[in-house]
Amino acid sequence: MSAPQIPNLNTLRRGGGRGRFRARGGPDSSSSSGNKDRVVQGTDNDASVSRLSAVELGYLEDPFARALTPMGQEMRRLPIINRGTYVRTTAIDQLVASFLGLKADSDPTWKLKKKQIISLGAGSDTRVFRLLSLRPALDIIYHEIDFAVNNTAKIKAIQGTPLLQRVLGQSQVSISNEGDELHSPAYHIHAVDLRTLAQKGEGDKSTGQDPGRRLQDFVDTTLPTLLLSECCLIYLSPNDAAGVVRYFTHTLFPASQETETLALVLYEPIRPDDAFGRTMVANLATRGIQLQTLHQYASLGAQRQRLREHGFNGGQAAADVDFLWERWVAEEEKERVAALEMLDEVEEWKLLAQHYCVAWGWRKGSTRFTGWGDLDGQSAEE
C-alpha cells in the first residue's frame, strides 16, 4: 500500500502523492469536501506508478504491479523515491509475514492458524495478490476498504487481467451491480467511507442502511486479524481517525478473554515542525493534500502512545524509514539495492526517510502471538 509523494516517500519534488492515502470519502456533500476527497482518491495513481518504478528497476519483485498501474502513466521515479518505496514495502512485508507465521522460525501452531487482514484505503495495492498466490499453504481472508471510485478501477483491472483472475480463482466470485464491491471466499473489496464507521458508537453493531452493516456481514471476528493503514487515517480528522480504530477495537473486535489477537500497522509521515517537515507540508498543501492527524501524531513516541490508547497492550513500536533501512535491511541487500541506481542525494535521502515511519502494535488474544518480538523499533527520537 502506499502513499502519494508523501506517504510513498514519493514526492516532495515531483508532487503527486500516493497513498495508502485512501479510503476515506465522506458524507459531507459540499463541493469543498468533494474536491478534497477527489484529491485523496487521486493519490492512488501516484502510488501505483511509484511501485511499478521500483519493480521495473529491480528494487522489488511484484508480478502484479503493471496490471494495477493505469496504462500510459508509467514513470521512472527519482532514486530516493524508489528507495523509499522499497524500504516501506519490505518493512511492512516483514511485519505481515511475521503476523501470518510465514517466517522459518514461526511458531508451528500459530503458522497453521487461519488469519485475516483488513487493509484501509487499499486502492491499487498488490499485497493481496502476492499473499493469495501463496495458497493453499497460506490460509487467509483479505479485506480491502476504499472509495467506490478506486474500487471500481481495481475491479475492472481484475476483470481484464488473466493473471489476477488466476490468483483470485473463479469460484464464488461476485461483483456488485455498481462494480465497486467484490466478494469471494478469500478476498473482499468493500466500498465503505471510513468516516461512517467512525460515527458508530462503541459496541454499536446495528445494521440499518450504513456501510458498516455490509462490513460486519463479511468480516470474521473469530480470526486473528491484522489492520493495515498506509497513509490512510492521516487524511481523516483526528476524531474520525480515532473513531475508525475504535470501530475495529471496540465494535467488531471487543477485547475479552476469548478475543483473538488484533494488530495494527501504520505507515505515516512524521516530524512536521522542523525545516524539512514544514517544507514537506507546504508542498503537499499546494496540491490540495491535507494531513489532518500529522501534528497530533508527529513523533515516534506519539505513534506508540496512540497504539497504547487504542488498547494494543501486547506491545507497541515505531521506527522511521531511515532506521528501517539501516537496521532491517541486511548489508548484502543494501549493496544490491545501492547498485541499482546512483543515489547522489544521500543527505536528502536521510532527511526524507526520517520524516516517514512505520508503527506497529498488537493486542493479546486467546492464541499467543509473539511474531514481532524480534523486530527492532526505535527507542528514542533519534
From Swiss-Prot:
Positions with biased composition (Polar residues): 1-11
Family per similarity comment: Belongs to the methyltransferase superfamily. LCMT family.
Summary of the function given for this chain in its UniProt record: Methylates the carboxyl group of the C-terminal leucine residue of protein phosphatase 2A catalytic subunits to form alpha-leucine ester residues.
GO biological process per UniProt: methylation
Region named Disordered: 1-45
Entry binding sites for S-adenosyl-L-methionine: R88, G121, D146, D193, L194, E230
The keyword S-adenosyl-L-methionine appears for this protein: yes
Keyword Methyltransferase: yes
Pfam family, one: LCM
Protein name stated in the entry: Leucine carboxyl methyltransferase 1
